[in-house]
Amino acid sequence: MMGKQLTAQVPAEPVVLGKMGSSYGIRGWLRVFSSTEDAESIFDYQPWFIQKADQWQQVQLESWKHHNQDLIIKLKGVDDRDAANLLTNCEIVVDSSQLPALEEGDYYWKDLMGCQVVTAEGYDLGKVIDMMETGSNDVLVIKANLKDAFGIKERLVPFLDGQVIKKVDLATRTIEVDWDPGF
């Protein structure tokens, strides 16, 4: 059985860095989809955790390589297609303490979730419920308050530091923006 020899630790602050795709070949290799900015960075953060049947398991990366357009991985103890297929669609999770400290002005998406977004004039635009990548910049998806004066349900505000985003205060969970509340 996989993972028996490892004491299953639990990531204190789980962060999803990617997910496992379909099996590749017959020796237990799997495709991997990385959501890190540079796809290969996902291999820098170890150990990986996965959740199966509501249990955390630590998995050990044995090796990885490029194959055509894909990244494929070999996990320790996963030696055939059947074992690999059990992991398809499992999210790859690390503890946030394994991630590098960010530079000023950079934030992890997970830290912005649930933040209250207000304009410089003090108008409450709502709460961050999601983030979107548009290619040129990230976009905050903000769920407006029930009694929004403009009758808006959801706002999309570009995460442009300095230009739109004036201040991010993670201690008070607020983001101050220069944005017209009518949008």
From Swiss-Prot:
Occurrences of domain PRC barrel (ranges): 104-183
Function: An accessory protein needed during the final step in the assembly of 30S ribosomal subunit, possibly for assembly of the head region. Essential for efficient processing of 16S rRNA. May be needed both before and after RbfA during the maturation of 16S rRNA. It has affinity for free ribosomal 30S subunits but not for 70S ribosomes.
Similarity-based family: Belongs to the RimM family.
Domain text: The PRC barrel domain binds ribosomal protein uS19.
Name the UniProt record assigns to this protein: Ribosome maturation factor RimM
GO molecular function: ribosome binding
Keywords from the named record: Chaperone, Cytoplasm, Ribosome biogenesis, rRNA processing
Single GO biological process annotation from the record: rRNA processing
Keyword rRNA processing annotated: yes
Quaternary context: Binds ribosomal protein uS19.
Entry GO terms, CC: cytoplasm; ribosome
SUPFAM superfamilies according to UniProt: PRC-barrel domain, Translation proteins
Keyword Cytoplasm tagged: yes
Main location, first listed in the record: cytoplasm
Record-linked Pfam families: PRC_RimM (PF24986), RimM (PF01782)
Cell compartments where the protein resides: Cytoplasm
